[in-house]
Each structure stands twice: as structure tokens, then as C-alpha cells.
Design a protein with these regions (language model features):
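Extracellular/periplasm-exposed beta-strand and loop segments of Gram-negative cell-envelope proteins
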Residues: 22, 49-65, 98-114, 144-153, ...
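Single conserved hydrophobic/aromatic residue that forms the stacking wall/gate
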Residues: 1-9
């Protein structure tokens, strides 16, 4: 804690933007990027985008997801001597996207749209002047309409459709964050 306070006291430049990458999405082979903008000392706006777009029709594999989201965050605790975008936070989020998942040659699921919203809790720990490690978990509601399909002689045949609703954990993050500083205070 003392080291963090010393870093904040030494560096009087404000964080104007943060660029992020969720390591958990990377492990799932899902390229992603996030941008977070501080709004004063206590609030911030986080935007995210993920886009794994992998397919191999020869092996009956498709892993495609195009998704975006936005989250408003409130940073907790005393903020006077703290670096922006560090510490504990609560957030409210909404995201949506399209998907197509096929993990074997027999069947797959395609969603024209999915939507999720909920609340997050997280903690951002400053590792260096410009580097932060962020942990967060989102709990909320997810809804989608999907089409189940099977393949026949290389063509996709729609077999059924349905709706899926889920209440519970909808988001988990371990992110590397790069703080970009602006002018001096």
C-alpha cells in the first residue's frame, strides 16, 4: 500500500484513458480489446469488443462471436491520493452480439442476437506506473434466440429453434490494463 501511495504522489499526470486486454478471453482464443475512460475521480465508462471468428468446415468446427458492451463503474473508497481506475469498483453493464458455435460435424448453434446485462464487482491492482491487473465478475441475466442446425453434405440444415435464458455469472475478467497519462495536474 505504501508503494502505491508513493507511485501516486510521484506521478502527478492524470490517467486519461486505459487500454485493456482480458487474459481469460485470450485463453479461449477470443481476441478482445477494452477502452476505459475516467469521468472524474469516482466514475468511469468501460467499452469492450470481442471477435473470435474461427472456422474450419473440413473438420466441422466453427467458433464465431461478434460482441460489444458498455459498463458504467463507480470506484469505491477514498480517491484523493489514489491513482484513477485503481481499487475496488461496482458497475452496471449491458452487452450484446451474434454467434455461431459448431464443435463437431453433427450439430451447431447460431444466434442472430444475444443480450446480457447485470452488475459487476471488481478490483484493480497497480503493478507499475502504467500497468494494472484487474479482476472482475459480473452477475446478471442473459437471453438469446438460437437455431440448432446439422450438416448434410456440406450444407447447414436448420433442425429446430429455441430460446435460452440464464440468470447467474455472465462475465469474468482478469485483464492487463495500460494506463495512458495526460497533462500534469
Amino acid at each position: 500500500i505504501r508503494r502505491q501511495r508513493q507511485m501516486c504522489i510521484r506521478d502527478r499526470r492524470r490517467t486519461v484513458i486505459a487500454l485493456k486486454n482480458n487474459i481469460l478471453y485470450d485463453l479461449a482464443l477470443a481476441p478482445n480489446v477494452e477502452v476505459e475512460l475516467p469521468v472524474g475521480q469516482r466514475w468511469s465508462l468501460n467499452m469492450e469488443y470481442k471477435c473470435p471468428w474461427w472456422s474450419n468446415s473440413k473438420h466441422g468446427f466453427c467458433y464465431q462471436l461478434l460482441s460489444g458492451g458498455v459498463e458504467a463503474r463507480c470506484w469505491l473508497g477514498k480517491r484523493k491520493n489514489r491513482e484513477r481506475l485503481t481499487g475496488h469498483f461496482l458497475g452496471i453493464y449491458a452487452e450484446g452480439g451474434v454467434y455461431d458455435f459448431q464443435f463437431d460435424k453433427d450439430k451447431g448453434y447460431r444466434g442472430n442476437y444475444y443480450a446480457a446485462s447485470g452488475l459487476t464487482y471488481g478490483y484493480s491492482h497497480q503493478l507499475a506506473r502504467h500497468l494494472v491487473l484487474e479482476f472482475s465478475l459480473g452477475i446478471g441475466y442473459l437471453a438469446t434466440e438460437y437455431r440448432k442446425y446439422t450438416t448434410y453434405e456440406g450444407d447447414l440444415i436448420w433442425t429446430s429453434s429455441g430460446r435460452y435464458h440464464f440468470m447467474g455469472p455472465t462475465k469474468a475478467k482478469i485483464s492487463l490494463v495500460w494506463l495512458i497519462k495526460g497533462r500534469r495536474r
